[in-house]
Amino acid sequence: MSKYKLIMLRHGEGAWNKENRFCSWVDQKLNSEGMEEARNCGKQLKALNFEFDLVFTSVLNRSIHTAWLILEELGQEWVPVESSWRLNERHYGALIGLNREKMALNHGEEQVRIWRRSYNVTPPPIEESHPYYHEIYSDRRYRVCDVPLDQLPRSESLKDVLERLLPYWNERIAPEVLRGKTVLISAHGNSSRALLKHLEGISDEDIINITLPTGVPILLELDENLRAVGPHQFLGDQEAIQAAIKKVEDQGKVKRAEK
């Protein structure tokens, strides 16, 4: 039986989402479409009469800005927002900045799908020579984390994401949900997938089939042990949501010329 409700989402679209590049820990901002997605998400939640007590985000701009726009649409700008690197997008290592379609051409669609969606495959780590290495690791936000800078990831599998996310869920977010607080988590595709895996008990093999579109609110109903009592629900126009999911899935494919 459902006792608690949790809303989570992947942030709105950013420039690198549109350019089909691995964004990861590079601090790309929302583009105009992403801002509109966030506002529409807020409108959807307002229509359903959601009143939030607390919002959790990553430390990346696109996650935080999405939360702000949602709260603005709700008229709930005063609601506290807490940010943690543990909700960051998966660290894609050496793949950061690369175009997914070009990667599919060079390595095959299945390999790119495994890098993007599998549970325990880790891409090659980022090196100091990588064009975005210093932009990431010289950023002040990573000097105030709960782990030393040299212990932050250089590449992650989805399993790694779940392992660094779970302490934050268990120690910070879950207690608020258990107190009856209505919580919004504005995160990323893979940190959201990792949390869904944990709460819904999705298998290591099946998680590869879970794809999340940008800017769509996800409702999870949880029991007294904070386990999902059913599958997650995308809130909104279901036909449009399925089209958005397909768009994300197609990012790792080679475009075929029409005959």
UniProtKB/Swiss-Prot annotation:
The modification N-acetylserine is found at residue 2. The lineage of its organism: Eukaryota, Metazoa, Chordata, Craniata, Vertebrata. At alkaline pH BPGM favors the synthase reaction; however, at lower pH the phosphatase reaction is dominant. Inhibited by citrate. It catalyses: (2R)-3-phospho-glyceroyl phosphate = (2R)-2,3-bisphosphoglycerate + H(+); (2R)-2-phosphoglycerate = (2R)-3-phosphoglycerate. Homodimer. Expressed in red blood cells. Substrate binds at residues 10-17, 23-24, 62, 89-92, 100, 116-117, 189-190. Its EC number is 5.4.2.4, 5.4.2.11. Plays a major role in regulating hemoglobin oxygen affinity by controlling the levels of its allosteric effector 2,3-bisphosphoglycerate (2,3-BPG). Also exhibits mutase (EC 5.4.2.11) activity. It comes from Oryctolagus cuniculus. Gene3D superfamilies: Phosphoglycerate mutase-like. The active site is at 11 (tele-phosphohistidine intermediate), 89 (proton donor/acceptor). This is Bisphosphoglycerate mutase. It comes from the Eukaryota.
